[in-house]
Structure formats: structure tokens, C-alpha cells
């Protein structure tokens, strides 16, 4: 099978998916939809580009996508390169000052901008931001209550791991109503100005 055959196959596959999705697109036209894009799905540049093309299609079909992205594997890779040890408790990364700095750098300075740029290249208008911007996500420190492998609850200091306390949707509504696609990194800020790393699933 040559490259043209592969292209035709991809086109037909996309056309079939679009046909199936059309009734839902029509039903939810002009509605805000929140999509979580996990770090494990960002396997390579091609995967990110394909995801962004799908987001552009949703936007052009009348929906208002809002992207909340993760970045766990990418953060882990960067920490490893810098020789910073990573510890987890029940799937949550224990986040000290140094780790938080890397988390913010990777999420906001790397992944966030790459997703927004790829969406823009698809002809849509994306804006990259984090939950700290305009105090969008007011967070508080995670209480550290987790369950171990034996399902026994214990309390662990997770450092700067937080949970959302309040979501200020004003900036999201302003952006989506003006034809922009918000791309949000899952960081939050506390009432006293502390930055917290938040699970993207929780934010979405």
C-alpha cells in the first residue's frame, strides 16, 4: 500500500467518524465542551498534531472546546534529565519547591504552548494559559489522605499538590464567546498566592 492509499484510507475513516458524530455535534452546537488531554496520549509530534486537528474540527462544527491538558510523563522525563528524584504516593507526584518549578516550566512553557500553536496552525484561535491566570482555579493544599495497596487510609504530605476549591469561569466564557479555544495547564493558586500542581482529571 502506497502513501496515497494510506491517505485515502485515513480520509474515509475520518469521514465515517464525522458522519457518526454529526448528530451529537448538531445537538450540542454552541455548547462549551471540556476535553482532557492526558500526557500519555502525547506520544509524539504527530499525535499532538492529530489531536489538534480533531479539536479544530469540533470548533468548526459549532462546538466550543476547552482543553485541559496533563503532562506527567513529560514532567517525569525532565526531572530525570535534571537528576531530580521523583516520588509518588497513590499515583500522585510529591511536589516540593524544586519539582514545582519544573512542573510549571514543562506544563506552561512547553506542552501548553505546543498545543495552542498546533491548534492555531489548524486555522483556529487558541490561547494557552494556566489555572493561575486571572485566578481561574483557586486551589487549596491536598489534605494528603490516601489509601495504600491494602486499602488502608493514611496521611502523607504531598507538598504542593492541590485540589480545586473554586473555578472562576469568567475568563473561559469571555474567550469562548470571542471565538478562542482556551488551552489550560492544571495549576492553581491559593488565596494566599501559593502555586499548586493539580491532577488534570480533577480540573476537567
Task: Describe the function of each predicted region.
Residues 1-204:
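Nucleotide/pyrophosphate-binding catalytic subdomain
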Amino acid at each position: 500500500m502506497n502513501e496515497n492509499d494510506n491517505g485515502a484510507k485515513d480520509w474515509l475513516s475520518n469521514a465515517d467518524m464525522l458522519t457518526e458524530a454529526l448528530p451529537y455535534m448538531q445537538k450540542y452546537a454552541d455548547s462549551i465542551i471540556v476535553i482532557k488531554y492526558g500526557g500519555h496520549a502525547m506520544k509524539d509530534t504527530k499525535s499532538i498534531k492529530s489531536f489538534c486537528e480533531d479539536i479544530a474540527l469540533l470548533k468548526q462544527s459549532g462546538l466550543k472546546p476547552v482543553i485541559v491538558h496533563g503532562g506527567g510523563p513529560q514532567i517525569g522525563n525532565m526531572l530525570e534529565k535534571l537528576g531530580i528524584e521523583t516520588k509518588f504516593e497513590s499515583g500522585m507526584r510529591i511536589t516540593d519547591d524544586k519539582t514545582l518549578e519544573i512542573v510549571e516550566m514543562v506544563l506552561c512553557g512547553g506542552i501548553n504552548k505546543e498545543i495552542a500553536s498546533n491548534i492555531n496552525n489548524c486555522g483556529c484561535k487558541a490561547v494557552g494559559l494556566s489555572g493561575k491566570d486571572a485566578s481561574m482555579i483557586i486551589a487549596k493544599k491536598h489534605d494528603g489522605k490516601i489509601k495504600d495497596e491494602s486499602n488502608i487510609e493514611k496521611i502523607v504530605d504531598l507538598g504542593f499538590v492541590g485540589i480545586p476549591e473554586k473555578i472562576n469561569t469568567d475568563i473561559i466564557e469571555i474567550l469562548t464567546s470571542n471565538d478562542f479555544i482556551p488551552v489550560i495547564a492544571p495549576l492553581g493558586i491559593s488565596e494566599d498566592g501559593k502555586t499548586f500542581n493539580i491532577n488534570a482529571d480533577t480540573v476537567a
